[in-house]
Amino acid sequence: MSADPVRVWYFRTAGSALGDTLVWTLAPVYFVTVVGLSPLQLVLVGTFMELTIFVCEVPTGIVADVVSRKLSIVIGYLVMGAAIVFSGAVAQPWAVMVAWSVWGLGYTFTSGATDAWLADEIGVDNVRPVYLRSAQLGRACALAAIGGSVALGLLSLRVPIIVGGVVIAATGVVLALVMPEHGFRPAPRDEATGTVRAMIGTGRAGARLVRRTPVLLLILAISAFWGAWSEAYDRLGEAHVIRDVGLPSFAGLSFIVWFGVISAASLLLSLFVARPANRRLERASRQTITRILLTADVALIGTVVVFGLAGAFWLALIAMLATNTIRSLVGPLFSSWLNQSITESSVRATVFSITSQADAIGQWTGGPAIGAVGNVFGIRAALVLGASLLSPAVALYARAVRRDGLAQMVEAGA
């Protein structure tokens, strides 16, 4: 039994958004208040996860190119769900680090395969509106899940994490039953060479495509710097609010409810801003998208610095909401930008995986240093340092704009 690929993509988006939001609305609070992680330990959770991604990203991406996109995606969801359940069941630093390392393994099975599967099933030229609409759907589902996460968190901070893991694993089970795979064309392999050598050959082909395509080299560098700054913000943002800024005493709200309110406000603002923007961006040129990505990175530097230095809760809240809104708009645009830069379907998942690997390198190389700064000088200093790591990405976007847009750059490298 199989269904329309666009509907399957929307289902996958909804399942991921529901499960991830159940987990991540309160997971940082769980790490800080229940597990008791220090700033360095918070970052090391991400470092171990990203090291796993770095080691496994290309091999699992090649599996998706040589064997099956669908199989890779299903395995990924099952592994991620099981790892999340374990992290909520065992509230110990070592268990959290092990669980999220295993989650990283599961993620690598999906990171290149999902986007490549969609492009194969509906065509590269049709993916942008699907990305943008699914991003809106994901925000709506996440908004619905925030209330559930808060309600479950009031019982115990472990519960929304465990339930979220179950939702993600269940999404994988349903995908195994309904996901079609009609457009997939395995990378060619000679029967004598076997699967392993075919995987190596596909990986080399993907690397050659990256080397000879200037825009893909730029994208890899941008991904690395993006990973470095996001490590500081993602791991330390909530800890900064809890330990440095403090939550106001208003109507007797629990800190759990406060974080639910912050998450809901962030999503509502993203929906309000994204709806008109998405309609326009469906028809935007690739050069326009490059300029938007450049502007977004400049804005992110400012909002993260303000967030890190803010002493008043309301100033920190405004900066946090602005940062989250900008990030929610950048994600689907960056994916579309990358997808249209890949001219060979047989290595599409591999190139996506290489890009994710660059992001992982940025996170695990920058993460421990940022965490050490947080331990010695405080979380504020770590957040500002992380924001400064976006500056090289801004310069790389500016270079792409100066070279007259993405299309010209691809042609020059082909």
Which sequence ranges carry the predicted segments?
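Transmembrane alpha-helices of Major Facilitator/SLC transporters
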Residues: T52-V55, W258-E282
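Helix-loop junctions on the cytosolic side of multi-pass membrane transporters
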Residues: G164, A169-A192, R399-V410
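Juxtamembrane intracellular "pre-TM" segments in multi-pass secondary transporters
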Residues: M1-A3, P180-L220
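Conserved MFS/SLC helix-loop-helix module at the cytosolic interface between two early adjacent transmembrane helices
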Residues: I53-A91
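Primarily marks hydrophobic transmembrane alpha-helices of the MFS/SLC 12-helix fold
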Residues: I73, T290-L293
